[in-house]
Swiss-Prot record:
Gene: rsmG
Catalytic activity: guanosine(527) in 16S rRNA + S-adenosyl-L-methionine = N(7)-methylguanosine(527) in 16S rRNA + S-adenosyl-L-homocysteine
InterPro entries, alphabetized: rRNA_ssu_MeTfrase_G, SAM-dependent_MTases_sf
Annotated residues for binding of S-adenosyl-L-methionine: 74, 79, 125-126, 140
Source domain of life: Bacteria
Protein name, as recorded: Ribosomal RNA small subunit methyltransferase G
Gene3D superfamilies, per database record: Vaccinia Virus protein VP39
Length: 206
């Protein structure tokens, strides 16, 4: 059932995935559903909704990633980082979260599904100092752009990009962009079977 739905949704998004990638994406949903019963990793309880609201929602960002090294801050159970890593095996992803149960889940996903381009780190974002800075900083967890840029400003390279996944846009928030940052592009995202607003904001250092 999930496999057929995934194929349909990928076709709607004009995305192609190998059989292995499709198995990994479905495997991630199945593991999230299983672990969620004990560890409360997400408020979404239904696997079909997990596929739409977590996996497909994450994958809408994939065509816009520029560079090779990315960090997903406040990743939770690995969103959007794990689906993006599955679909972009040539890129490297660091998944950052401060809760140990989420990191344990991510590491089990990596082990069982054999995903080799992910590094999970248990840390608060402001305390994490990377040895090498990132081409992209991803987040769909932060309530405000100001918080994201304030806490993550030290993570990207000088030419790196912040990718903020948002629902409905807050125009006042966009107008109050912190000093030293500029909005490069606002992209309207379309998630199959989801009648809710989704936007990707690309922000750069000035």
């Amino acid at each position: 059932m999930l496999s057929a739905q995934l194929k349909t949704y990928l076709a709607e998004m004009n995305m192609s995935a190998t059989e292995l990638q499709q198995k990994q994406l479905i495997g991630f949903v199945e593991m999230l559903d299983k672990w969620n019963k004990a560890y409360n990793l997400t408020a979404v309880r239904d696997p079909e909704q997990m596929l739409i609201r977590h996996v497909m929602d994450s994958l809408t960002v994939s065509p816009y990633l520029e560079g090779q090294r990315f960090i997903d801050v406040g990743t939770g159970p690995g969103l959007p980082g794990i689906p993006l890593a599955i679909m972009n095996p040539d890129k490297q992803f660091v998944l950052l979260d401060s809760l140990g149960k989420r990191i344990r889940f991510q590491k089990q996903v990596q082990f069982e599904l054999k995903i080799n381009n992910i590094t999970s780190v248990e840390s608060r974002v402001e305390a994490y100092i990377p040895e090498i800075k990132f081409d992209g900083v991803l987040s769909r967890a932060f309530a405000s752009i100001q918080d994201m840029l304030s806490w993550c400003h030290h993570l990207p390279t000088e030419k790196g990009t912040f990718y903020a996944l948002k629902g409905q846009l807050n125009q006042q928030e966009l107008q109050e962009m912190p000093t030293g940052f500029s909005l490069v592009e606002t992209i309207v995202l379309h998630v199959p079977m989801l009648d809710e607003q989704r936007h990707l904001l690309k922000i750069a250092k000035q």
